[in-house]
């Protein structure tokens, strides 16, 4: 079994991105499955170019995308990605789309195919604050989630995919009064999420 797990580079003036810091701390193998780690750029063009090539090349059994949601107090598992790019903040290339589709002619939305509620339940049982989120926003995180699910759909693949938002790390919250979480807790949470995806795949006969 093979799982592609991505995090993002820093953006918005931050020196780190807790999503990538947590992802790169994951083991290379979890319960016999290969964990492929990749850092994505915080650019609308980058995720739409890189993710399709990466998914088709690696053909993973699951794709778990992660990103920073500064201000959220818990790990949030996204339910849906929408075909919209709309941002008040430029991406790392200075691009600021307004009411543009991620892909012209693609569906309005895709639901995550990882077990969203089961992941949240497992995280909470491990005493890690977690919740289901019904919006991944309209910035690069949503674009990445939509791109992954659209790529899998048009390629006829059976790969499971979803997105997990993580809070600021404690380091990032030193100078701002915002909710934060220890990087080790975030990393542990991602490992639990991966194991729940394994359970889901096993039940379906992967």
Swiss-Prot record:
- EC top class, in one word? hydrolase
One GO MF term attached to the UniProt entry: pyroglutamyl-peptidase activity
Which NCBIfam families does this one have? PRK13197.1, pyro_pdase
Q: Active-site residues? A: 78, 141, 165
- Gene from which this protein is expressed: pcp
* Biological process terms in GO annotation: proteolysis
> What SUPFAM superfamilies does its record include?
Pyrrolidone carboxyl peptidase (pyroglutamate aminopeptidase)
Localization annotation: Cytoplasm
- Keyword set includes Heme: no
Q: How does it assemble?
A: Homotetramer.
A Pfam family per the record:
Peptidase_C15
What the record says about family reads: Belongs to the peptidase C15 family.
CDD domains assigned: Peptidase_C15
Question: Main subcellular localization, coarse class?
Answer: cytoplasm
Protein purpose: Removes 5-oxoproline from various penultimate amino acid residues except L-proline.
* Keywords carried by this UniProt record: Cytoplasm, Hydrolase, Protease, Thiol protease
**Entry protein name:** Pyrrolidone-carboxylate peptidase
| CC per GO annotation | cytosol
């Amino acid at each position: 079994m093979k799982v592609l797990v991505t995090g993002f580079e820093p953006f918005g003036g931050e020196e780190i991105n807790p999503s990538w810091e947590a992802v790169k701390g994951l083991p290379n193998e979890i319960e016999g499955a290969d964990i492929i780690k990749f850092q994505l750029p915080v650019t609308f063009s980058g995720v739409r170019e890189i993710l399709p090539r990466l998914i088709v090349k690696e053909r993973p059994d699951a794709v778990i995308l992660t990103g920073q949601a500064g201000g959220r107090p818990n790990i949030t598992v996204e339910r849906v990605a929408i075909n919209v790019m709309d941002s008040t903040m430029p991406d790392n290339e200075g691009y600021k789309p307004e009411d543009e589709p991620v892909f012209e002619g693609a569906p309005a939305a895709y639901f995550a195919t990882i077990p969203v509620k089961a992941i949240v339940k497992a995280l909470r049982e491990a005493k890690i604050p977690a919740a289901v989120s019904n919006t991944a926003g309209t910035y690069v995180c949503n674009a990445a989630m939509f791109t992954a699910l659209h790529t899998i759909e048009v390629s006829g693949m059976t790969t499971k995919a979803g997105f997990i938002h993580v809070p600021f790390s404690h380091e990032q919250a030193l100078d701002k009064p915002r909710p934060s979480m220890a990087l080790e807790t975030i990393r542990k949470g991602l490992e639990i999420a991966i194991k729940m995806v394994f359970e889901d795949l096993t039940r379906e006969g992967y």
